[in-house]
């Protein structure tokens, strides 16, 4: 699947694009990141962020995918977002999958405390 690429988009960027579109010229707009890449690369980057090993690669035949999934992976899904940028002034806050994965990782990773917790107080507010 290394040759099959597609674009992604962070939910925050979708919301920003929809809001920009409310005041923009009528029309259809593509909201996508600026860096289409393979699913393998995204999985590898996610594993790297999580400190996990990359999963073994599997052929499409061995994956036992549905006909719909096979059709999806048979094509490239590059999306151009230039119209939204030009006419709506939209700019993705997460221009590549890397920034998106880092944002998700930041909200799902446990915080590391640098000091012990403060003692509980008996005072009610």
Predicted regions and their residues:
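Substrate-positioning beta->alpha
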Residues: 1-21
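Residue-level signal for the nucleotide or nucleotide-sugar donor/cofactor binding architecture
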Residues: 6-9, 37, 79, 95
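Conserved C-terminal active-site "lid" loop/helix of NAD(P)H-dependent oxidoreductases
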Residues: 11, 44, 63-91
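Residues in well-ordered alpha-helical elements
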Residues: 12, 40, 82, 95-98
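Mid/C-terminal beta-alpha module of Rossmann-like enzyme folds, strongest
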Residues: 14-69
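Generic structural signal for individual residues within well-ordered alpha-helical segments
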Residues: 15, 43, 85, 98-101
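Residues within well-ordered alpha-helical secondary structure of globular protein domains
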Residues: 20, 48, 90, 103-107
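Amphipathic terminal alpha-helices
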Residues: 95-125
